[in-house]
Structures are given as C-alpha cells and as structure tokens.
C-alpha cells in the first residue's frame, strides 16, 4: 500500500519543526481538537503536509470557498505527486434553489447548471476513498450537504476480472442499476456502449480514459484501459472496479420500500392539510407527489429526487443525512483552514436551508421529509469528526475553547517580521496619508487603504486622484475577473494605491504592499474587530518595509489587543532573526501561489486582447458561434486543471460574445 510522501525542496525551518512535531504527537496521542496558530506567510500548508506524512491517515482539508480550496489543492498536489489529492466542491456553476414566496404567490422552480468536470472530480474523490488510504480531499463547506449512502455506493460497485464467469447482459443490467446510460454513438462520462462481445464503459470519475471488457461466451476474456480520444490502448488490467455514475444510487429493493414509505407519508400529510382546511395545498401536494412516484416506478429517478433522500436511504425522520464525511474511514483526520471564517459558515448552513423549506412544506409543494435533505447541523457535524486541527492566524473563541493544545507558528521562513504599527489622530489624516503614500511611490511600493463605508471609499478615491495619485477603488459589485485584473494591475504598477472596504478576501497577500492604512480604526464593529484588524495588519507582512497606520482618536479594546498581539509576534520574530543571523527578504517570487490570475503577464497579452476585439467585431454570426464553442472547450480544460480564474475569465468572455448574437 502506498504511503504519503512529501516531495519538496523545502526543509522545515523556524517554528515549523516544533509545530510539526507537536501536532503529530497530539494526533498520535488521540487528542480530538488542536489549533495551529500560524501567521500569514509562515508556511502553514507545508506544516499540514508534513503532519499528514507523519501520521499516514486519510485526510480531509476544509476551506471556506472554491477559490481557496483550488489553491490548497494545487499546493497539496505539488507536495504529494505520488498520492491521491482530490477536490470536492459544489458542482453547480449556477444554482437557484426551489422556493415559494407566499406574499406574492410565487413558486420558483429549482434551476441549476452542473459543471461536468467538477462532478467528475467529486466522483474521483469518493471512489479514491474506497480504493486506497493515501487520500487527501480538499473540500469546500458543500461537503456537509446530503450525499447518497456510502453503503449503497460501495455495494453497487461493479468488480470485474479476466476469467470471471459473467454474462455480458448481466453486466449491462448492473451498469443500468448504477445509473450508467447506454449510448453507442455519443460516448462520454457515465455512459457505456456495446459492440458484439465488446463492452466499453466510461467511468464517472474519468475524463479521458475508458475500460474495454471483451467477452468469450459467458467468460470475461480480457480487460483493457484505452484513451477515449485516440483509441490507443494504455494497458491491460487484471482487475477493475467501476463505481456508480451517481452518488444517489440505491438498490431496487430499497427503491420499492422508498415508494411505499413516500405513499404512506403522503396520505398522512394530506389528512393533516385537509383537517386544517388547506384544500388547495392538499391538491397541489397530491398532484406533484403522485407524479414523482410514477417517475420513480418507471424510470428509477425523478426531478428533485434529493427531496426523497430520507426514504431512499431508509433513515428515520430527523436523522442526519449522509455526507462526504461518511465516506471516510473512522480514523481520518481533518484540517479546517481559515477556521475563524469556516466554522461560522458551517454553523449557518442548516438554518438558511430550513427557512427556505418552511414555505415549501407549509404550502403543499413538498412533503415534510424534504427537511431531511439538508446540510448537517453544527452538532451533527461535530459528532462526525474524528480528530481535527484548526488552522488560522486568528483562531476564534470556539477553536481556542475546544483545543487541547494551541501550537504557534510565528517565524516566517523568509525572516519577514510582522509590520510596525502607528496610531495617528484623525485630524489631518488625509494630508498625513498622502505624505506616506508619496514615500511609498518613490520606492516603487504599493499601498492598501481600508475604509468603513462605500461613500467614504468613493470620496477618498476621487480626492486622491485630484492630487495626482494613481488610485483605484475595489467594491463588492466588481466581479471575480475584474477583481483579479485590478490586483494584477496593482502588482504591475499601473496604479499605486488600492482603496476598499473589505480587503480580507483571498488574493490580497501582495509582496509589493508596504503600507496598509486603516481609516476609522476606532469605530467598533465586525470590520474593526480584533480578528479583522489582525488579518488586515497581515496584509503588510510580505514586505520588508511593511507598516500599518491606524487613524483613530482613541484606542479601542480591539485595537489594543491587535497591537499587543502584533508586537508580541514581532518581538519573537526579531529575536529569532538576530539569534540566527537572518536578514528579512521581501517575497520576490511566489506570484503564482498568491492567485493564478494575478500573474504579471507581459504587455503582449493586452495587445492580443485589443486585436481580438477588432477581429470579433468583423466576424459573422456563424463565426462567432464557432468561436464560442472553441472557448467553451478551453474553459472546460482549465476547469479540469483547477485553473478556475482562467476558466471564469473565458466564461465572462463567452457571455460578452453571446450578447453579440
């Protein structure tokens, strides 16, 4: 069995060796909760990788959004090239949940667009857990949402070997039960085709490789793996396990039981509604549910099948749904990255889902069992955990209370220290700020300014422009691609100052930034809490000249705590550097690690984009349609490679082109 093996030029330095040793010891001793308090840029991902290598256990890494999950997945793939590093996030490109608004009598049907590539990656993740132990899955919070039963998923797996006595038609019937679809012409993921005694299966977890099973009578003669595009044989296989094409598969016996159970619940609910005089709601519910039952009897599935997941899995009412966590072996470990954001997000999921379903159940659009197709409650989530390491520069009260040990990682491998903090009175703040900006511009460095309101940010941006400073304002209405473009332009030096309200989102750890100015630092609220202030201060921690100026007339509790904590860390870092003769260096490279779309691309790209605009304007309608198809293929390829910013950039370009049709 393969073991986890970190492949890297880095050696643990600074606080890393101690952190790795202590966290490993905690896991081996069976401690349930630990916290890695690691400052920005201290190499937390590398520490996590070394701990995984030490304990050799299947691992789930939880991130609070898709972009961060993709970045972590890329980093772990670099550290573990010989192991299975998988990616599990929501597969919806677009999702409008089913809802009912009683005030206007408006029913909104569920509408969604599923990203086929991400669905493939999800299948790859779950199948890897049943095939091997050297598995790391990087997931977003969508992993606490309902997924099919792991028991049914495993029981319906098709295991084939050469020499096995198995009838071809029997294998076909099994594939159909696993929700594979027969299509002899359009051969793609989740489908199979038959040519005489040859059966070709395209597994749900693959993009480019399929399995060819050759029969001789009732015996499997040969199994080969081949490239779907070229038809070239990759190799012969002595054994192959085909996993179901859907996570919501169930056996025919369970389906029959589920239909009976749905009918019983329907009768009970209809009696309740009629006794309350809700005749319209009762009629609506009966009509919709009977149609779904018919579909389940005839086809084995129906639209919105997930709303009947409790019946399909045979769970009692109110019991927790099956999720990705149930697919892991009992001894798995979990890292919760940026836990100060991720934990509150996990807490909020259940209530949001329940509030939306209340109206659907009350007005006869769904049976009460629809409540059981839901994310886990926070208490259920806690029960499913085995051993957890919270990872954050600013752990929240929950993490600190739960953890048996808090391991600090304060020393950065680059020798960089936390920035110096200055508090300046509000009177004359703008003139003072302009003076500080000019000092940075002379050194070819950049400045981030955070304000509390949109109005203040807009006024400040206009004022700075009027005095000749090259400044841009980044607000919440800016889409992902434009946001990446702004960050890239800041790094390229097309402007020097970026003004924003919330500068804590991913992608803003920029080495060129040597000054962070916090206006209204003494106005208490979530943007000026201790956690937010420490995170904002960290934005200046990648430059050797890093400095933070807080503009305030008084020092609040949150400010004092943030200043004290930063000074404490700074003292430890400076002492370590002096003791070991380390001279801090601004991060020069690592642009790719910050965020893919901010890479300093040469000016050639811009020339190309302007030429492309001219060409598109002269294209015929048919040529634009063909160009859109080409771009869609490129977009899918980038999605496979986890280059989501590039894929999103192409998606936005496709939207613009479709407007021209």
UniProtKB/Swiss-Prot annotation:
Pfam families attached to this UniProt entry: Helicase_C (PF00271), ResIII (PF04851), UVR (PF02151), UvrB (PF12344), UvrB_inter (PF17757)
UniProt keyword annotations, A-Z: ATP-binding, Cytoplasm, DNA damage, DNA excision, DNA repair, Excision nuclease, Helicase, Hydrolase, Nucleotide-binding, SOS response
InterPro entries noted in UniProt: Helicase/UvrB_N (IPR006935), Helicase_ATP-bd (IPR014001), Helicase_C-like (IPR001650), P-loop_NTPase (IPR027417), UVR_dom (IPR001943), UVR_dom_sf (IPR036876), UvrB (IPR004807), UvrB_inter (IPR041471)
Location of the protein in the cell: Cytoplasm
Chief localisation class: cytoplasm
Binding, ATP: 38-45
Residue span(s) of domain Helicase ATP-binding: 25-178
Domain Helicase C-terminal intervals: 429-591
One BP annotation, GO: nucleotide-excision repair
Domain of life from the UniProt record: Bacteria
UniProt xrefs under SUPFAM superfamilies: C-terminal UvrC-binding domain of UvrB, P-loop containing nucleoside triphosphate hydrolases
GO CC list: cytoplasm; excinuclease repair complex
Domain UVR: 625-660
MF (Gene Ontology): ATP binding; ATP hydrolysis activity; DNA binding; excinuclease ABC activity; helicase activity
Short sequence motif Beta-hairpin: positions: 91-114
Function noted in UniProt: The UvrABC repair system catalyzes the recognition and processing of DNA lesions. A damage recognition complex composed of 2 UvrA and 2 UvrB subunits scans DNA for abnormalities. Upon binding of the UvrA(2)B(2) complex to a putative damaged site, the DNA wraps around one UvrB monomer. DNA wrap is dependent on ATP binding by UvrB and probably causes local melting of the DNA helix, facilitating insertion of UvrB beta-hairpin between the DNA strands. Then UvrB probes one DNA strand for the presence of a lesion.
Family designation: Belongs to the UvrB family.
Family matches, as HAMAP family: UvrB (MF_00204)
Comment, domains: The beta-hairpin motif is involved in DNA binding.
Assembly, per entry: Forms a heterotetramer with UvrA during the search for lesions. Interacts with UvrC in an incision complex.
Name of this chain's protein: UvrABC system protein B
Upper taxonomic lineage: Bacteria, Bacillati, Bacillota, Bacillota incertae sedis, Caldicellulosiruptorales
């Amino acid at each position: 069995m393969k073991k986890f093996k970190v492949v890297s030029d880095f050696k643990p330095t600074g606080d890393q060796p101690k952190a790795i040793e202590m966290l490993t010891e905690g896991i081996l001793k069976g401690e349930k909760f630990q916290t890695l308090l690691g400052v920005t840029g201290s190499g937390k991902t590398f520490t996590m990788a070394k701990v995984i290598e030490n304990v050799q256990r299947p691992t789930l890494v939880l991130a609070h959004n898709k972009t961060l999950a993709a970045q972590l997945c890329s980093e772990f793939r670099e550290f573990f090239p010989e192991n299975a590093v998988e990616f599990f996030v929501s597969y919806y490109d677009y999702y409008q949940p089913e809802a009912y608004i009683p005030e206007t009598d408006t029913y909104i049907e569920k509408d969604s667009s599923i990203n086929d590539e991400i669905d493939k990656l999800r299948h790859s993740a779950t199948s890897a857990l049943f095939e091997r132990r050297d598995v790391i899955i990087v997931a977003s919070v969508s992993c606490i949402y309902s997924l099919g039963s792991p028991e049914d998923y495993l029981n319906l797996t098709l295991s084939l070997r050469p020499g096995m006595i198995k009838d071809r038609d029997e294998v076909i019937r099994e594939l159909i039960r696993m929700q594979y679809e027969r299509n002899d012409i359009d051969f793609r993921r989740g489908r199979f085709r038959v040519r005489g005694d040859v059966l070709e299966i395209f597994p749900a977890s693959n993009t480019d490789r399929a399995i060819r099973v050759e029969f001789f009578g009732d015996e499997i003669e040969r199994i080969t793996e081949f490239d779907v595009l070229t038809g070239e044989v990759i190799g012969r296989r002595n054994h192959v396990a085909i996993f179901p094409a859907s996570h919501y598969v169930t056996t025919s016996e369970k389906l029959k039981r589920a239909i009976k159970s749905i009918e019983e619940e329907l009768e009970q609910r209809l009696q309740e509604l009629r006794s309350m005089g809700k005749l319209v709601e009762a009629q609506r519910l009966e009509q919709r549910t009977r149609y779904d039952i018919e579909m389940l009897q005839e086809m084995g599935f129906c639209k919105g099948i997930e709303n009947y997941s409790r019946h399909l899995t045979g769970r009692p009412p109110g019991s927790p749904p099956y999720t990705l966590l149930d697919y892991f072996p009992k001894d798995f470990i979990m890292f919760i990255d940026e836990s100060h954001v991720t934990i509150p997000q996990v807490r909020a999921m259940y209530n949001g889902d329940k509030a939306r379903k209340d109206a659907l159940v009350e007005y006869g659009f769904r049976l009460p069992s629809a409540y059981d197709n839901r994310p886990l409650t926070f208490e259920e989530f806690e029960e499913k955990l085995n051993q957890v390491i919270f990872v954050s520069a600013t752990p929240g009260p929950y993490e600190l209370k739960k953890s048996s040990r808090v391991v600090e990682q304060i020393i950065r491998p680059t020798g960089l220290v936390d920035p110096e903090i200055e508090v300046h009175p509000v009177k004359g703040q703008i003139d003072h700020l302009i003076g500080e900006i000019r000092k940075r511009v002379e050194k070819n460095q950049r400045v981030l300014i955070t304000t509390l309101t949109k109005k203040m940010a807009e006024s400040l941006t206009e004022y700075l422009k009027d005095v000749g400073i090259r400044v841009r304002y980044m607000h919440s209405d800016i889409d992902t691609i434009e946001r990446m473009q702004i960050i890239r332009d800041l790094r390229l030096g097309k402007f020097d100052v970026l003004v924003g309200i919330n500068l804590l989102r991913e992608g803003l750890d920029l080495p060129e930034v040597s000054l962070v100015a916090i206006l209204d630092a003494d106005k208490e609220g979530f943007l000026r809490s201790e956690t937010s202030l420490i995170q904002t201060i960290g934005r200046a921690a990648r430059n050797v000249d890093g400095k933070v100026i807080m503009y305030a007339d008084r020092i609040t509790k949150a400010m004092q705590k943030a200043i004290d904590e930063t000074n404490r860390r700074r003292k430890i870092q400076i002492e370590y550097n002096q003791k070991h003769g380390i001279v801090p260096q601004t991060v020069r490279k690592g642009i790719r690690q910050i965020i893919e779309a901010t890479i300093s691309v040469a000016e050639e790209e811009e020339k190309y984009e302007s030429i492309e605009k001219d060409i598109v304007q002269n294209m015929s309608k048919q040529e634009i349609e063909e160009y859109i198809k080409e771009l869609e293929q490129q977009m899918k390829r980038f999605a496979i490679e986890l280059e989501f910013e590039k894929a999103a950039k192409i998606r936005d370009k496709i939207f613009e082109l479709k407007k021209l049709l």
